A protein has these predicted regions:
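Extended glycan-interaction surfaces of carbohydrate-active proteins
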Residues: 211-241
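Terminal accessory carbohydrate-recognition/targeting modules of carbohydrate-active enzymes
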Residues: 1-219
């Protein structure tokens, strides 16, 4: 697993590739500033999401099948590239959809982003349907230091889309947490969020660089540096590790 953080949340991703080559993901969201009773160090709001976003999507009215992961990279953001097959009529179209996922936390806000890009790699148009999808968990008013909390997940797009050969369909999933009397996070400027995360990663990468003859040691230090720098939260008493 790996953990990533912004100033208002952390996300723990338990992920892997099964024997058939499919990607699996389980997310645990932690909101350090949404305090639970009794108000001790680890008494923060936590919520796990074990849901497959690709399983919600249909291509030609049927579920995507036979995922094959081709590449996984992590540089402070997790990127997964894979292909899916689908059924068209009575025939299976192998590797007809290429999917790219990018996963990262917001730098400043209490939400976590998952970007999805679907590309039609075949020579015929395909019809893709994305459902209206939203999940809301609420806590009792008596359980939180600041009252009731809400943890929510939603998709940025819904509807039916026809992809011509080579075209892409892009959308994102947003996972957020808030006090019940605050406005919900219904959308995000996803380009700005990714840009802010990249800017931080570049700053950390260019500072306090360890250079030794051992590239593995250098990489281990670089990842440890990211983790140490990002896990600083914006508390009511100021920034705190």
């Amino acid at each position: 697993h790996l953990e990533m953080s912004g100033q208002m949340l952390s996300v723990v991703l338990r992920y892997g590739v099964d024997a058939e080559g499919a990607f699996h993901l389980n997310r645990s969201l932690v909101f350090p500033m949404l305090r639970m009773k009794p108000n001790k160090t680890q008494s923060n709001l936590k919520q796990r999401f074990d849901v497959s976003i690709p399983a919600l999507i249909t291509v030609e009215d049927k579920s995507l099948t036979d995922e094959k992961v081709s590449d996984i990279t992590f540089d402070g953001m997790l990127k997964v590239e894979s292909s899916f097959s689908y059924i068209s009529g009575r025939s299976q179209v192998n590797d007809g959809i290429k999917m790219t996922r990018q996963l990262y936390p917001s730098a400043l806000s209490p939400f976590y982003c998952e970007e999805y890009a679907l590309e039609n790699t075949k020579e015929k148009p395909v019809t893709i349907r994305i459902p209206e999808w939203k999940i809301v968990y609420s806590t009792p008013d008596s359980a939180g230091v600041y009252g009731a909390y809400s943890v929510e997940a939603l998709l940025s797009k819904k509807g039916t889309f026809v992809l011509k050969p080579g075209e892409k369909l892009e959308f994102y999933a947003l996972f957020s947490g808030r006090k019940i009397n605050e406005s919900p996070y219904l959308s995000a400027n996803i380009g700005a969020e990714k840009g802010a995360r990249k800017k931080l990663l570049e700053q950390w990468s260019n500072s306090l660089v360890l250079s030794t003859p051992d590239p593995v040691l250098n990489s281990m230090f670089a990842f440890a540096k990211i983790r140490g720098a990002e896990s600083i939260y914006k508390t009511k008493g100021g920034l705190m590790h």
